[in-house]
Amino acid sequence: TITPQPQSGNSKPRVFRLSDDKAIINSLGFNNKGIKKVKKNLIKHQKSYLNNKIVGVNIGKNKNSSEAIDDYLIGLEELGDLASYITINISSPNTEGLRDLQLRGKIEKLIKKIIDKRDEIKNINTKPILIKISPDLNEDQLRDIALISLANNIDGLILTNSTIKRETNLISMNKGKKGGLSGRPLYNNSNIILKKMYELTNGQIPLIGV
């Protein structure tokens, strides 16, 4: 996930393998080189990677940003014309306060501004916008996101990011580490979210299971 300014992410160690559970816990925290560097790299390799290839760009907010929406708008403006699609990552558990952007009032405001900005920029007004959501949302929250996505013609939903929940049957030594859990323990719940969201959107929005 790319943020406007470069940031180092959370302190190391921040990736833990749970081999016995076929899982990983990460607390990376959007470590990246920032939009300027990424844009430069994309332009440099534009001819080679755009040759019949799909290039997705995930955008997020900086850890210390006071204006989250502005960070996403900057990402869209700067990288939109270099991507095949843009993913709005509002579901990582490793940036404090980020997942609050999934709450009804906040996500509605964010999505409207993102769509308005995309539609007004000639080079990116046809680029698909996808939203990546958490597996830890309750049914009311999923319903809100479904309705808001339908109302604003969101092009797709990515289901799901990693979870902060821990199954009681985890047996690996690193099971208590802080961060987002992904892998086999998340498989069933992620598929449940996928099924629920298909029902809530009446199959009208493409869903990507990860």
Where do the PLM segments sit?
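Glycine/Thr-rich beta-alpha phosphate-binding loop at enzyme active sites
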Residues: 93-106, 142, 148-205
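Active-site beta-loop-alpha junctions enriched in small/polar residues
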Residues: 2-3, 60-64, 91-93, 132-136, ...
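Metal-dependent enolase-superfamily TIM-barrel catalytic cores that perform enediolate-based chemistry
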Residues: 71-120, 134
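Non-cysteine beta-strand/loop elements that form the S-adenosyl-L-methionine
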Residues: 1-10, 80-91, 155-163
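Conserved, mostly hydrophobic/aromatic
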Residues: 38, 57, 88-89, 132, ...
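A gly/proline- and charged-residue-enriched helix-loop-helix capping module
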Residues: 3-51
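Short beta-strand/loop segments at the ligand-binding rim of alpha/beta enzyme cores
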Residues: 50-59, 120-137, 199-209
